[in-house]
Amino acid sequence: MTEIRRETKETKIEVKLEINGSGKSNISTGVGFFDHMLEALAKHSGMDLEVFCDGDIYVDYHHTVEDVGIVLGEALFNEVYPVQNIERYANAVAILDEAAVEVDLDIGGRPYLVYDLPREGMIKDFDMELVEEFFKSLVFNFKIAAHIIYKRGTNKHHIVESAFKSFAVALRRALSYRESGIPSTKGII
């Protein structure tokens, strides 16, 4: 179990995370759609996740979404590193009705994000461009490489939810147990 607290002038965040959980979550960021996505992330990755954020959402959702990504990435890093006895690489495609998004992951200590989802538009009052900000913060603080590739879809909610679910399933697969030690020819990650 990892617990991280982070407080800035813009947000106050607490994250509790157990990667070998059962998918339970307790999420409260003040941003309803974002809470829904984090619940999906926990459920489909199998991790237990608590996220509480008191952010300046009266200004914009940006600080809340970005900072939750930072803290969640740090918590995942603390849970996983040093890397050993995991698969390391994984991918998944989750569909939601007409939408499909593929996520490819490398839990390899080298942060990189390829992001190919639509960035324009709103889901109620949630700006689509915030999805990229969240994943960018998460990926760089977790120190993983992720390719998040839009395959098809027209409903923005479905597209984003497909991305979160695909990320969750790929993460669960990448973190699955492997007996052979450190999954790298370098001998270290």
From Swiss-Prot:
Molecular function GO terms recorded: imidazoleglycerol-phosphate dehydratase activity
Q: Which family does it belong to?
A: Belongs to the imidazoleglycerol-phosphate dehydratase family.
Main localisation, per the record? cytoplasm
EC number assigned by the record: 4.2.1.19
Reactions catalysed, semicolon-separated, are:
D-erythro-1-(imidazol-4-yl)glycerol 3-phosphate = 3-(imidazol-4-yl)-2-oxopropyl phosphate + H2O
Organism of origin is Nautilia profundicola (strain ATCC BAA-1463 / DSM 18972 / AmH)
Q: Look up the domain of life of the source.
A: Bacteria
Q: Which SUPFAM superfamilies match?
A: Ribosomal protein S5 domain 2-like
Gene it is expressed from: hisB
Q: What is this protein called?
A: Imidazoleglycerol-phosphate dehydratase
Q: In which pathway does it act?
A: Amino-acid biosynthesis; L-histidine biosynthesis; L-histidine from 5-phospho-alpha-D-ribose 1-diphosphate: step 6/9
What is any one of the record's Gene Ontology cellular component terms?
cytoplasm
Please verify whether the record's keywords include Zinc-finger. Answer: no
Subcellular location, record wording: Cytoplasm
